[in-house]
């Protein structure tokens, strides 16, 4: 009985630590990061930091979350400076993609407004203190530091002067990314809920039907591990899918931009490891203890 209580205490401790790590991962925004410092240094060293290129960096395209009323968007020129209150829409860039390429705005990676970012499940933010250009835009109120990640699909946009196949591909990519994001968030939420139930059941096992409740808690912990695995794999798939979206001159990243997973995702993986360990401990111990009891009974009967 003492060993069973010790196993329950260890598994409960592991599950609580796992729950804390999982909640930390869910509510922090450092799942994925991009670092454009080397990219900017490379562009500067190649002499691409001329006034035109600098102007392009100070006139962010649709990727930047702008403040203000979207009704003012259409009255602004696509390549005009973005004033406080101006909002750029994705279709503005896409409708004029040929002219943009002709003007050379997107032909060169150094002409693109790329800034260091970090993102989580709920929002994407720019890293302050690295690039003075984005710092200036945020301080002036032209751009927001963080923007919410979409979990709903807006009405299909009508794109002019753009091939139908490209328009359809962009919309299909939006659908696929939306589903992947929903799967990631949904399964992670279910994992947190099931893990909380498992912790409660494990705590109850100290006072009532220790063998049964311990086994049920172990099954709940293993179910949490399955949900976490699905969620984390889906998140990795969504990141890879987004990096390979078409057209590359809008959605892709230059080779010299460093990008990768960050500490929030590490917390989620650590949570997965702890909860699987707790689940295996809770589910395996009753069978091991039962085998030992049967072996002792058999040895005693043999002696008699």
From Swiss-Prot:
Q: Where in the cell is it found?
A: Endoplasmic reticulum membrane
User: Transmembrane ranges?
Assistant: 187-207, 216-236, 268-288
Q: Does the keyword Glycoprotein apply?
A: yes
**GO biological process, alphabetically ordered:** negative regulation of osteoclast differentiation; regulation of cytosolic calcium ion concentration
List the glycosylation sites.
Answer: 165
Task: Give the Gene3D superfamilies listed for this entry.
Answer: 1.20.140.150
Task: Cite the ranges annotated as topological domain Extracellular.
Answer: 26-186, 237-267
**Key words, A-Z:** Endoplasmic reticulum, Glycoprotein, Membrane, Signal, Transmembrane, Transmembrane helix
Signal peptide positions are: 1-25
List the GO terms this entry assigns under cellular component, sorted alphabetically: endoplasmic reticulum membrane
InterPro entries documented for this protein? PMP22/EMP/MP20/Claudin, T178A/B
Query: Which ranges form a coiled coil?
Result: none
* Membrane topology per record: Multi-pass membrane protein
Question: Which residues point to the Cytoplasmic side?
Answer: 208-215, 289-304
Q: What does this protein do?
A: May act as a negative regulator of osteoclast differentiation.
Q: What is the similarity comment for this entry?
A: Belongs to the TMEM178 family.
- Protein's UniProt name: Transmembrane protein 178A
Q: What organism does this protein naturally occur in?
A: Xenopus laevis
